[in-house]
Design a protein with these regions (language model features):
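DPxDG-like acidic metal-binding loop motif
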Residues: 66-97, 106-110
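Phosphate-handling active-site elements
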Residues: 47-57, 81-99, 231-244
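Conserved, helical-rich catalytic subdomain that frames metal- and/or nucleotide-binding sites
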Residues: 109, 120-215, 230-243, 251-262
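Conserved glycine-rich beta-strand-loop-beta hairpin in the small C-terminal domain of fold type I
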Residues: 223-225
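Active-site glycine-rich loop that binds ribose-phosphate moieties when present
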Residues: 95, 99-100, 114-124
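ATP-binding N-lobe of GHMP and related small-molecule kinases
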Residues: 1-66, 84-90, 127-133, 137-140
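Residue-level signal for inorganic ion chemistry
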Residues: 15-17, 38, 71, 136, ...
Length: 262
């Protein structure tokens, strides 16, 4: 069972929607081959409200298979855009999002939240602090399904260290702005299987560690790594240097909203 904390940050995809004269739904996302995860959400929206068809274009800024929640962010962004275009209430959009993924409703609302159970129990919490991070990843990605499968296998073999941290304590540390406590609590059980599936993750961790972040952890099931810094200046300097070394790295800040109009 999960016990995790989620936070919205200023790493984003850009989504545009337009009406069609027919009933077709067309999604274009140059960065992703095959069916986009936002398509089922778009179909559910159309079925729920009996709308015309629409064209959707997604420009990825959130890397794929990084554990940064890009798929759920696209579901949320598409539903938000369609809701605006067809003037539908936020509650209805949240209901559709919940049918598409456990964290999709959170992505729609944004801010901070603790997720437990299988990820379906999401409890938002207020956090007045703004955190400065670097979101980085190696060139490869990690499949969430493969990471969880390997975790179960390694857990049975006793190869996963016991983790006593819990999301409630992480939430308290975030509210207080206690970076020392946060550093001690930010443990990801999927880190071991993720690094076994993609050893390059450890190299990105090492590079981030050279800039002395207050906190460093693998995001989700990887391959992305997040580092928390005391100041925006430190985060920006780290991101610039990693970019020079050919690593995807972005300086980001925590946000109180999940989706924004631009």
């Amino acid at each position: 069972l999960l016990d995790t904390v989620m936070a919205s940050v200023s790493l984003f995809d850009e989504i545009s929607v337009s009406r069609r004269a027919d009933g077709r739904i067309n999604i274009v996302c140059p960065a992703i081959k095959g069916e986009n995860t936002a398509l089922p959400a778009a179909k559910l929206f159309q079925e729920r409200f009996s709308t015309c068809g629409f064209d959707i274009r997604i420009e990825k800024g959130i890397p794929v298979a990084a554990g940064f929640g890009g798929s759920s962010a696209d579901i949320a962004g598409v539903l938000y855009a369609l809701g605006k275009m067809f003037r539908k209430d936020f509650e209805s959009l949240t209901e559709i999002a919940a049918r598409c993924g456990s964290d999709a409703p959170f992505m729609l609302k944004g801010g901070f939240a603790r997720a437990t159970g299988r990820g379906e129990k999401v409890a938002p919490f207020e956090c007045g602090k703004t955190y400065h991070l670097v979101a980085a990843k190696p060139s490869g990605g990690v499949s969430s399904g493969e990471a969880y499968k390997l975790y179960d296998e390694m857990k049975r073999q006793g190869r996963i260290p016991e983790n006593m941290a819990d999301g409630l304590q992480v939430a308290k540390a975030l509210k207080k702005g206690d970076l020392a406590c946060l550093s001690a609590l930010c443990v990801n059980d999927l880190a071991v299987p993720a690094k076994k599936l993609l050893p390059q993750i450890a190299e990105v961790e090492r590079m981030l560690g050279q800039f002395s972040p207050a906190c460093l952890f693998i995001s989700g099931s990887g391959s992305g790594v997040a580092a928390v810094f005391e100041t925006e200046v430190k985060a920006s300097a780290c991101a610039r240097e990693l970019e020079k070394r050919g690593v995807f790295a972005r300086a980001v800040t925590t946000m109180q909203r999940g989706v924004e109009e631009i």
